[in-house]
Amino acid sequence: MVQGTTSDAGKTTLVAALCRLLAQEGVRVVPFKPQNMALNSAVTADGGEIGRAQALQAVAAGLQPHTDMNPILLKPSSDTGAQVIIHGKARSDMNARDYHAYKPIAMQAVLESYQRLQTQYESVLVEGAGSPAEVNLRERDIANMGFAEAVDCPVILVADIDRGGVFAHIIGTLACLSESERRRTVGFVINRFRGDISLLEPGLKWLEEQTGKPVLAVLPYLHGLFLDAEDAVEHTQAVRGAFRVVVPVPPRISNHTDFDALRAHPEIDLQLVGPGQPIPAADLIILPGSKNTRGDLEWLIANGWREALLRHLRYGGKIIGICGGYQMLGMTVADPHGVEGTPGESAGLGLLDVATELTRDKRLEQVSGVCAFADVGVSGYEIHMGTSDGAARAQPAFLIDGRPEGARSADDQVLGTYLHGLFDTPDACAALLHWAGLNSDVRVDTAQLREASLQRLAAAARPLLAALRALPDYSR
């Protein structure tokens, strides 16, 4: 099991790298994360929903993503509440206190999935969540040492040296663990190192003397990796292209990986705009998905986006709304059942003649079809609770298995769709950008970029695999 001294220490990439290395050797390996908290999720082949990180790790292992790889997914809908997804299906919305009391039941689901994977695969690589040093969350823990103790698996502790304070992070984390948990920790990985390794070696020696545990590997800082991120939204990008794409970043943005292909496009200047930041001029504005459509719609209006969108359209710009962003573009968003919070109805931005009603049932499906405005194929996935209907649906965005999907305005300046991942299909991405005004022969293949990054990760982590196999109690 890989645990980290902090969030974003490198747990996900380390598990992905080890999955790829073992898969290359012919080992039947599978990733597993007991509990994940993220708004960036993926739809599985078995019709469920898991964290984006486990979908990436599945690709690294040469597998189709499956709900057993991430049995508990928490999707925050507010600062104190989240939608609880078990074995790929939404069960209920809970506040933090209620979920803490629910954890023994959640642990049963975790162990069921883990045991199924154990019977099917030679090796199960487990990723922890956050840090095991959160002493306030120790009781009923199912994500870190609580799980490791329950299934009796060894733990590697990874720390990010690029942030600074790496030795304090490791020593401090060990100090917060129980004696049995410290014994379970077999060694450390120092991640994202850049510089002269000889200058680090005295510190490594000191760490091993202080803890009695080995530093298993020092992994380099790898620039330019193209991998799916779960939570951190990258707000900055070097300005390269002349075609300006602007995306607002509301508090509950979801599935921001929709924009990864645009970030990699050499002719696009992608700008993600957070609260309080000036809204720049754009050729294309994209409203992203949201875990709280009405709340994020209120945020957009309060931050001046309604006026910015109207001005953008007056000057001939184009707008795309994805999932929650599509719902916001319509006339109204109704939540009669309180799916996302207090029941009620909100006026939309009024840029598409559709009305949305949020429903308790969630649609989860991988889909494919063609663009309604260009003769090219498209594929992606749907994750949403709600339906949208109205006159604008007569001019759809896509045809999915022959059925109309999404909507376009009468003047063809505004497009809305429930389809996530729509830019990941190279030809569909080019067609959408052409619709928005960019005539380019460039094709960005996100799958190819991701594969190259996984290969780089695996090559960098090979010394770690050798070190693990040299441990006395290591077993594949």
Curated annotation (Swiss-Prot):
Pathway: Cofactor biosynthesis; adenosylcobalamin biosynthesis. The keyword Lyase does not apply. GO terms for molecular function: ABC-type vitamin B12 transporter activity; catalytic activity. Residues 242-428 form the GATase cobBQ-type domain. CDD domains: CobQ_N, GATase1_CobQ. NCBIfam families: cobQ, PRK00784.1. Belongs to the CobB/CobQ family. CobQ subfamily. This is Cobyric acid synthase. The lineage of its organism: Bacteria, Pseudomonadati, Pseudomonadota, Betaproteobacteria, Burkholderiales. The gene is cobQ.
